[in-house]
Amino acid sequence: MNCHDGLLIFNVQRYSLHDGEGIRTVVFLKGCPLKCRWCCNPESQKANPELIYRRSRCIGRDACGLCAQNAPKGVIFFAEDQKAVVNFGCAGNDFSWCVCCPAQALAIEGREVPIGEILDTVEQDAAFYRHGKGGLTISGGEPLLQKNVVNLLKQAKERRINTSIETSGYADREHLLEAAKYLDEVFYDIKSLDDEKHYAYTGVHNKRILENLVSLCQSCPEKKITVRTPVIPGFNDSKEDLKKIETFLNELPIVKWEKLPYHTYGVGKYEMLGRKYSL
């Protein structure tokens, strides 16, 4: 995927303290080849803009009703409480009509943003970066799915901005190594050493991910790399599963290994996107 002069993003989170050193501005890129069953950012998965509906914001048919007047036929209905009901299966790919919603209950998730504009946003907090630790963290989705991420990182370094990335590792190896040239820190997910389980829970095999981590460590031995493992009940939470990951990582010069607890903070987003949470 490649936006010609920018990146497809779905969120920018400022003042983050958990995605790299110091105060970070986290830019979330859209599109991911994995479909993790526990994903807390389902709006990150599709590599194109999509419709999202926040029902709690809807002010109802009698007070508004503009969505039904502007949406394609069959997309909008109303419940007994007068709030809109969205038939996502009929929504198509053109969501321009949803700008009519005054409460922003209906919105487009994902927009292309020029690299310069992204970096200008990051530099709004430059005072924190210049006088202490902090900088830009690229997350997703899988940020390496977008080719322009290298240009973003390169231009960030030209502006003397500290850079980090959060990646699944499921990416083209050369693209990963090229991006690494402009990264101060890499957060790299290793979810399971069991390939059968990995495929069942994420939709992809783990061979590329494991090989890419080895290549990254060999090609960039000085790079600060933190491996993260989300510990998911029934998937990789057994002592045996975690020991396999630990044994694999012990052969590599990893800075540290973080085990992240399972949570359900993102479950509500699935309903907003017309999907079901699958874990």
Where are these regions (language model features)?
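N-terminal pre-core extensions flanking Radical SAM catalytic domains
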Residues: 1-2, 6-8, 26-27, 75
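N-terminal-biased segments
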Residues: 20, 28, 50-57, 96-126, ...
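Iron-sulfur cluster-binding cysteine motifs and their immediate structural context
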Residues: 37-44, 65-83, 94-111
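Short, basic/glycine-rich phosphate-binding loops at helix/coil junctions
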Residues: 97-102, 191-194, 224-225, 271-273
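A structural motif corresponding to the C-terminal lobe/cap of the Radical SAM core domain
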Residues: 247, 255, 270-279
